Amino acid sequence: MASFESLIKDVLPYVPGCPDSLIRNNLRSATIELCEKSKAYTYDLDPITTISGTYEYEFDQPSGTDVHQILWATYDGHDLDPISPRSLELNYPDWRDKSGTPTVFLQKTPDTFWLVPVPNSKKVNGLLLNVALKPSRTTSSIDTNFSNDYRDGIVYGAIYRLLRIPGKEWTNPPASADYFNLFQNQINDAELRGRGGDTGVKRTVKYKSAGLSPRKRYGRYGKELDY
């Protein structure tokens, strides 16, 4: 696991005087936003055994993460379809009282989901799920591979958030807007990679501008990226 603490040094030169704790919190928030919008942090959960008469199940995701979305699910080798709460009640009004072979799923919380119809038999390791994860609001770290692959996006996201804070010595709304655009570009790239549309992204940035003023640091950062 890679700690958010380890990324502070990449952000601090662009927000001089900013407390480490504030940078760390914004690194976490930026990572959560990147994960939610790109769905790039994917994970195959361990197979789940269903129980007859039980429709609610818990995710067994890695510690320090929440399940943002179920990307696909299979039951006994057959695909399940996602369903919204409204569609569930409209199309299966008495589903709690009926059992059968599940055909749809509904994610209720970051920790739980439902199967409908209610399973009518036990299926050992019969349920497979692929999910999009995101860091929890209290975690201090993120998967090392994800951090390495999307380091630029995480850093840009933290910088744009910090630069827009009003009344600080590092406040810089114009630079914040540009870093926001860089962050959005990284989200788009992450989404493409998450869908398998890219086999790799070359890192082009070196965070080496500690001796420059905030505006020059910002300008140099953009120049190195050729934006």
Predicted regions and their residues:
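Glycine-enriched, solvent-exposed interface loops adjoining structured elements
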Residues: M1-Y227
